[in-house]
Swiss-Prot record:
<feature type="region of interest" description="Disordered">
    <location>
        <begin position="72"/>
        <end position="93"/>
    </location>
</feature>
<dbReference type="Pfam" id="PF05166">
    <property type="entry name" value="YcgL"/>
</dbReference>
<dbReference type="InterPro" id="IPR027354">
    <property type="entry name" value="YcgL_dom"/>
</dbReference>
<feature type="domain" description="YcgL">
    <location>
        <begin position="1"/>
        <end position="84"/>
    </location>
</feature>
<protein>
    <recommendedName>
        <fullName>YcgL domain-containing protein VV1_0131</fullName>
    </recommendedName>
</protein>
<dbReference type="InterPro" id="IPR038068">
    <property type="entry name" value="YcgL-like_sf"/>
</dbReference>
Length: 93
């Protein structure tokens, strides 16, 4: 299964996967407005490979059912919160 991957011009770390290069017909207009101008990153064969940040089976399922897959960036790390939690844990030990 081939798919084309595009990065968002408006939302850093956001990628859109579609089954056919430059065919955004299955992507809702509201999503395309929020996504901004798509910039083609690559076309890949999803068979027999893995992806760094997303489950490949979810990508395939979404491409088949919805006609696209939207990859959002991971939430930012809250280092201060992690530090506070470690300090609290150390006090309890």
């Amino acid at each position: 299964m081939l798919c084309s991957i595009y990065k968002s011009s408006k939302k850093e770390g956001t990628y859109l996967y579609i089954p056919k290069k430059d065919d955004f017909s299955q992507v809702p207009d509201t999503l395309m407005q929020m996504f901004g101008k798509p910039s083609h990153v690559m076309t890949v064969n999803l068979e027999g490979r893995s992806l760094a940040l997303v489950n490949i089976e979810k990508v395939k399922e979404s491409l088949n059912n919805e006609g696209f897959f939207l990859q959002l960036p991971p939430p930012p790390e809250n280092l201060l919160q992690q530090h506070k939690e470690r300090k609290a844990q150390q006090k309890n030990d």
